[in-house]
Amino acid sequence: MATIATGLNIATQRVFVTSENRPVCLAGPVHLNNSWNLGSRTTNRMMKLQPIKAAPEGGISDVVEKSIKEAQETCAGDPVSGECVAAWDEVEELSAAASHARDKKKADGSDPLEEYCKDNPETNECRTYDN
């Protein structure tokens, strides 16, 4: 499991196979930087997750907030479980969908002249000429 984000580490296995095909145990426990478990401790340098506030109509931000709460509840007991990883993957996908929806909304209505010309194609400002 590898994640590219600020504050996350790559998880490694505690046992690996050498060229002699016998397992070798790593010394000591593997500690992960659990940045998703922010509610149980104070953080000075870690990024905190905030719900998305500015989202288009359709309730995407509500779904993202709900999935963040569910992911936090899922990860409360075992933050390195597969269920926890899947819950945060869902949050990431929903956040990306909300971001794409906001970008699309900005692109659709970004030019006021185009909106004006859709309503008034006969005006001088909106005429197009072919040579």
Curated annotation (Swiss-Prot):
Induction: Induced by light. Repressed by darkness, cold, anaerobic treatment, heat and sucrose. Changes conformation depending on redox conditions. Signal peptide: none annotated. Its main location: plastid. It comes from the Eukaryota. Residues 105-131 have a biased composition (Basic and acidic residues). The keyword Chloroplast applies. Acts as a linker essential in the assembly of a core complex of PRK/GAPDH. Coordinates the reversible inactivation of chloroplast enzymes GAPDH and PRK during darkness in photosynthetic tissues. Monomer. Component of a complex that contains two dimers of PRK, two tetramers of GAPDH and CP12. CP12 associates with GAPDH, causing its conformation to change. This GAPDH/CP12 complex binds PRK to form a half-complex (one unit). This unit probably dimerizes due partially to interactions between the enzymes of each unit. This is Calvin cycle protein CP12-2, chloroplastic.
